[in-house]
Amino acid sequence: MKIHRNRPLLLLVTAFILFSAFRADKPFITIFTIGDSTMANKKLDGGNPERGWGMMLPGFFSEDIRVDNHAANGRSSKSFITEGRWEKVISQVKKGDYVFIQFGHNDEKTDSARHTDPGTTFDDNLRRFVNETRAKGGIPVLFNSIVRRNFVQPKDASIAKDARQTPGEQELPKEGSVLFDTHGAYLDSPRNVAKEMGVVFIDMNKITHDLVQGLGPVESKKLYMFVE
């Protein structure tokens, strides 16, 4: 989801940081963001309307809080590590900094460079991010994936329930008015790891699901890359 109208979500994250994170004894706090295209910075050439939500965060903070966005298009938790991107981030983390972690969209891809399994390898990568952040004195925050814009007919609700168990780019029924997601258990791994390790978890999927469902099939297109 490439959102360019992120205000409800960003206000929630801003409130979280301002009320639970601020340290008066530090000159500034850095929020490092790691994830995929839904979070990543975008080129603005040619009037491109696409924005990742991490790109929009700096405008919601004072100069005491800096956002360093390392999210990249097409990356999974696995490829983010193997490409050396995580090493670049963790080498900069200081005591009191935050690391926002959001993967899942691309972990379900079938190619070996990106694929991980929820409950095993995906969870292990999330644990690594958490453990190494804490080892540097940083504070990890886990997010699950932004909802995909998949609307179906009300009569296909049972298909939606089945799709929740089998993530992937399966064939979808005819578009209707009911939103459902196809991330499957990849939505649960960040929640489970957060509970296991005592990490703050933000249910990004629920937040965006409620937003998109509330807007409906037509108005929700304004949040995605439906360019006419």
Name each model-derived stretch.
Residues 23-71, 87-95, 99:
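Serine-esterase "nucleophile elbow" of acetyl-processing enzymes
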Residues 39-40, 74-76, 148:
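Short histidine/acidic/glycine/proline-rich micro-motifs that form metal-
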Residues 76-84:
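Structural motif
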Residues 14, 38, 144:
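Ser/Thr-centric signal marking residues that sit
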Residues 36, 70-75, 114-115, 173-175:
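Short, basic, glycine/proline-bearing loop/turn elements
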Residues 6-28:
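Bacterial Sec-dependent signal peptides at the C-terminal "C-region" and cleavage site
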Residues 2-5, 26, 84-228:
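Alpha-helical cap/lid subdomain in secreted, periplasmic
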